[in-house]
């Protein structure tokens, strides 16, 4: 179906008192992203010509958090209802475009549902998103005559008979810009709340003989709003289980879908296995046959085929080639790169460092600002001393180097191909190819040594 041009209004002016937070409610996160950002992303994916964000409380925080989005900021200085909020945005509506109204605290609305609503909007009428609830207490009821929508009655204004209606208003609707402006101008606050209800435009449209078409979302969670942290946590689990189901059906083995969090985008190969309590953040790619142990955090990283990440490992902004093994208890920080078959063991940290093919750093090591060649052995307790208190410097280690335990490499320093660094050495000068570097105090031995005795 050919759609008109469309702009989106997102209502985000509420204080969120029940969140008990200094942060505006819509900036609280779901799946690692602000609730309102989910809604903005949906609007952009729909192809909105403009996104008008109606704000009030915490405007500076909102503008800072959403500074990268192309938004038209609309101030609602007083919160006098949804109709009043839309009235503030109305001067920006073009007559020949459709206006879609969304909410910053309803984060899981899907693009698919919104597109169906957009397609269903009748010419000159209103498309309205509704659901049926077993217990509709507190929600505006959809009134009908002969099956046709005639209006919406808020719960506090409804009669006992109207309160028996199970079909309720979600607040999401779409209408033509010129019609919307005309109806908004006719709103009054003659109701129990003393507010201007956007829902009153339904009755106004019906009185003009306009058609109102109701559409239902695919899932109830799409239209659930958030007013407190309990509701947010429940919606988080709903979202996460939905993501887990999609991954399971796509061939990813999640050992317990209830203990998996996706806070971004996961691209994966075949036969991927993910154990419990794993968190995926940002954009992550997992190759074929990747295995991730329990308690790992993977963020903005590429993991190659046949890699195995052992429990409680953190990988951030890193790139792993095929057949690498990591952890347990390892940390790969931004700029870490492992070439094919490399191994990083327990309590090893890497930052802005490359570990070559088949190279190993097995235990208790820090590699920062370093280039390590192929087939290198990094002994336990090795540290690249890359910082002099003011600037960072680089360590370069050639292929086939053996670095003994408890070695300190004071950068800038280069170790040539095939060199050996004796255990306990502090390397302060370059080491040539195939050379042995050793710096130790000569060992002495005192026979019959007695330890000091504590004074009683």
Curated annotation (Swiss-Prot):
Ligand binding (UDP-N-acetyl-alpha-D-glucosamine): 11-14, 25, 76, 81-82, 103-105, 140, 154, 169, 227, 333, 351, 366, 377
Co-factor binding comment: Binds 1 Mg(2+) ion per subunit.
PROSITE patterns listed in its UniProt record: HEXAPEP_TRANSFERASES
Catalytic activities: alpha-D-glucosamine 1-phosphate + acetyl-CoA = N-acetyl-alpha-D-glucosamine 1-phosphate + CoA + H(+); N-acetyl-alpha-D-glucosamine 1-phosphate + UTP + H(+) = UDP-N-acetyl-alpha-D-glucosamine + diphosphate
N-acetyltransferase: annotated segments: 251-456
Amino-acid positions noted as binding Mg(2+) in the UniProt annotation, renumbered to this chain: 105, 227
Enzyme Commission code: 2.7.7.23, 2.3.1.157
Highest taxon above the source species: Bacteria
Stated name of the protein: Bifunctional protein GlmU
Gene field: glmU
């Amino acid at each position: 179906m050919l759609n008109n041009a469309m702009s989106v209004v997102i209502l985000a002016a509420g204080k969120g008192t029940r969140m008990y937070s200094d942060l505006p409610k819509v900036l609280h996160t779901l799946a690692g992203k602000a609730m309102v950002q989910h809604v903005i992303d949906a609007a952009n994916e729909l192809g909105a010509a403009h996104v008008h964000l109606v704000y009030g409380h915490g405007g500076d925080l909102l503008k800072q958090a959403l500074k990268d989005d192309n938004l038209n900021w609309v101030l609602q200085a007083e919160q006098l209802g949804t109709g009043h909020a839309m009235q503030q945005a109305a001067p920006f509506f073009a007559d020949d475009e459709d206006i879609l109204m969304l909410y910053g605290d309803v984060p899981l609305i899907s693009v698919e549902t919104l597109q169906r609503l957009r397609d269903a909007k009748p010419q000159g009428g209103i498309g309205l998103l509704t659901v049926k609830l077993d217990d509709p207490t507190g929600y505006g009821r959809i009134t009908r005559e002969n099956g046709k929508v005639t209006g919406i009655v808020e719960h506090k204004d409804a009669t006992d008979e109207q309160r028996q209606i199970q079909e309720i208003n979600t607040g999401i609707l779409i209408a033509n810009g010129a019609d919307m402006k005309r109806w908004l101008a006719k709103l009054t606050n003659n109701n129990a709340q003393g507010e201007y209800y956007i829902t009153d435009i339904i009755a106004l449209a019906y009185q003009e003989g306009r058609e109102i078409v109701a559409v239902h979302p695919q899932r109830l969670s799409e239209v659930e709003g958030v007013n407190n942290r309990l509701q947010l946590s429940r919606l988080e689990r709903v979202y996460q289980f939905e993501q887990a189901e999609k991954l399971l059906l796509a061939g990813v083995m999640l050992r317990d879908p209830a203990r998996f969090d996706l806070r971004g985008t996961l691209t994966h190969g075949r036969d991927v296995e993910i154990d419990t309590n794993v968190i995926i953040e940002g954009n992550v790619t997992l190759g074929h046959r990747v295995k991730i142990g329990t308690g790992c955090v993977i963020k903005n990283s590429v993991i190659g085929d046949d890699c195995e990440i052992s429990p409680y490992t953190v990988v951030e902004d890193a790139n792993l080639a095929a057949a690498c093994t990591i952890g347990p208890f390892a940390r790969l920080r931004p700029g870490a790169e492992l070439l094919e078959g490399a191994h990083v063991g327990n309590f090893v940290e890497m930052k802005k460092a490359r570990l070559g093919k088949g190279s190993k750093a097995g235990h208790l090591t820090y590699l920062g600002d370093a280039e390590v060649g192929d087939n290198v052995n990094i002994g336990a307790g090795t540290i690249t001393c890359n910082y002099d208190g003011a600037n960072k410097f680089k360590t370069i280690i050639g292929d086939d180097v053996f670095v003994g335990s408890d070695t300190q490499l004071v950068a800038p320093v280069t170790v040539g191909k095939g060199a050996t660094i004796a255990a306990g050495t502090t390397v302060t000068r370059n080491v040539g190819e195939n050379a042995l570097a050793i710096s130790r105090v000569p060992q002495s031995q005192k026979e019959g040594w007695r330890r000091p005795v504590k004074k009683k």
